[in-house]
Amino acid sequence: MQSWFQVVSLTYRKAPLTVREKIALSEDEAKSFMLKVKDFFDVSDLLVVSTCNRTEVYVNSSQSLTTELIKLLLIFKGISDSEEYLPYFEIFENSEDTIRHLFEVATGLHSQVVGDMQVPNQIKRAYQASADAQLAGPFLHRLMHTIFYANKRVALETEFRDGAASVSYAASDLALSLVHQPKILIVGLGEIGQDVCKNLVARGVTTIQITNRTRKRTEEVAGELGCEVVEWEDLDKAMAKSDIVISSITRSEPLFTKERVAEL
């Protein structure tokens, strides 16, 4: 039986931030959504990629599922008016086009910072989630390993990722262009937060404070990079003394509001 590898894609290229925020999936939500797709549709492979700039659902199926996938995703996120949101999505229903699109996404060609080095890790985590859920068949396994091999060749054999090849590098670049010898506070020490910290240290910034909801992670990063630890409870005090605050916290609601900043 013939099958089609297809994708529905919501990205910064067509959707504003307010829309992307509503539809973005946390890691736990992505896992739950994959099980929903499995329950509703006959798919042999399923991959869900969701970051701050994109939410994409790839499936391999014997029938076209793109419109149904979008509707299911919107319902899953509590959005009932699918007609309003359909124009924000890009759809690829041809297997060759979908494969090419995934290759381009995985190598960072479609990232806001072209060549973003964090994208391959995001794709790997999405693939691991598919494998853990028994939703990666022979086709997806072979495709993903081919993509990882291609990514390795890009990194080793080309200069594609030279320069500001990540959001974290671009953030540190912007910070240093705004203030001379800034006092910087980094809030959140996930992959991006740690990368920002490393980039700033590598570029000679000496006054860096860091804080994280998990104390252990803060101490580990501080010990590795020589940054000053700020207790999470003292976040507002540290903000008031900082020239620049860089946040990479994953939350459903904003951590920093206009009202909170006004009270500093």
Descriptions of predicted regions:
Residues 14, 20-32, 173, 195-198, ...:
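N-terminal loops that bind phosphate or other acidic moieties
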Residues 45, 207, 226-228:
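Conserved beta-strand segments of alpha/beta enzyme cores
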Residues 28, 32, 64, 68, ...:
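Conserved active-site and cofactor/substrate-binding residues in soluble primary-metabolism enzymes
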Residues 222-264:
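Rossmann-like adenosine-cofactor binding region
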Residues 147, 163-168, 172-201, 205, ...:
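Glycine-rich adenosine-cofactor-binding loop
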Residues 84-180:
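Glycine/serine-rich phosphate-binding loop and adjoining beta1-alpha1 elements at the start
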Residues 1-111:
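A glycine-rich (often HGG/GG-containing) alpha/beta subdomain
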